[in-house]
Amino acid sequence: MGMTPTQRATLEDVTQFIYREARLQDEHQYDAWESLWADDGVYWVPANGDDIDPEQKMSIVYDNRSRIALRIRQYHTGKRFGQTPQSRLRRVVSNVELIEDDGKEVRVAANAMLFESHQRGDVVWASRNEYTLRREGDDFRMVLKKVVLVNNQSALYSMAFLI
């Protein structure tokens, strides 16, 4: 099924937003990354599948906006042992799909591959990311970012950064 010109424009806008979000994370610009979040934003990395209830089952990450801010403050202390020295990161985002647009919020999904290089070794993290983005002026704010890791049913030995 084809897209309308409005849908194509929306998809281009949200794709650029997601690319910017990925770049900010890769460059460890976490204050700027934090500014992309809505006040009621939720950051969720489920464990053991992708269709669980995060209120009932364990998650790798299930953070509200204040917890996101706390993680960033902790990172800035320089005392995050897992990130000393800092990992070098690079994400590749692809297959961005417009799922729903109700005029106020846009739901999109994308595939992502993250390469992490650290003194303990290199790791590749693969995921399907789902976003709910709220329109705010000419930009968006993240209301939900759900990162479904391909291997989220396996032991994850180190994830000392915000994926």
Go through the PLM ranges and name each one:
Residues 9, 56, 121:
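Conserved aromatic-histidine-acidic binding/catalytic patches
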Residues 21-23, 79-86, 118-120:
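Short helix-to-loop capping/linker segments positioned immediately adjacent to catalytic or ligand/cofactor-binding
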Residues 39-109:
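A solvent-exposed, acidic/Ser-Thr-rich amphipathic alpha-helical stretch
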Residues 12-16, 59, 66, 124:
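A generic "alpha-helical surface" signal
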Residues 21, 33, 68, 108, ...:
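Hydrophobic pocket/interface hotspot
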